[in-house]
């Protein structure tokens, strides 16, 4: 099954800016790998299908594991090891974003001390690398953002912190005029999720904003000074696109669907294939044939 996205034409480029190339890459997110619920088998199926499509690289939108946030070192290390072994099936360059479930031991119920050397984002950094960064590929600029900020009371908020905002502003300012930008972030910057999942948002007892980036307007203001073609997002497990100010905010469905219990609000388990063709972007959502072995329990 594949669901196609809209085609957006980029503006013309100056002589000083190399023409953007043509290639495909895959964006997948929210694997939530675990030894339960056939999750490793599902990731195996998914990664083999991605590899068979032969994209030039893949980008992972966060929530690699289930879970590191509220568990001890043994469980967190085990699910990270499981993810890293399974990821080898991709056999291609891979760029990671951090998700809330990837942060280690922050919830008090984990029993992990804040002085633990792997506490917070350190476990992710040791295994996956930096939490925010950028790179160029065939005259496109890719930006990976960190939307997960643990709080002093051992909870978390979806936010892009001040140091990162300064970095992003400088990073985009240094680009050649007209160079197309594609951003990746775990928690959405722009989404319609609160409209069709209103009861889930309103009914949740949350001290902090954990569904969408709390200071998204600050990020969007920086984006206005660059040619941001698309933002690839995860976290909600629902496939959607919102077009805002000539940027596509594409939220991909999850590899795990409804946390390995079937489709999530109509979106089956899958990933997003992004096609870039000389400054034009299109995308489609692909499923990979996973069938849950348990009845759905989560909304």
Q: Predicted segment positions?
A:
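N-terminal export leaders
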Residues: 1-8
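N-terminal active-site segment of His-dependent metallophosphoesterases
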Residues: 10-76
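Extended active-site neighborhood of metal-dependent phosphoesterases/phosphodiesterases
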Residues: 17, 70-180, 206-209, 214, ...
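Active-site glycine-centered loops adjacent to acidic/histidine catalytic or metal-binding residues
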Residues: 30, 62-63, 99-100, 186, ...
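Active-site His/acidic residue clusters
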Residues: 151, 189-204
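Histidine-centered catalytic micro-motifs
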Residues: 183-189, 229-239
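Acidic, His/Gly-rich catalytic cores of divalent-metal-dependent hydrolytic chemistry
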Residues: 278-299
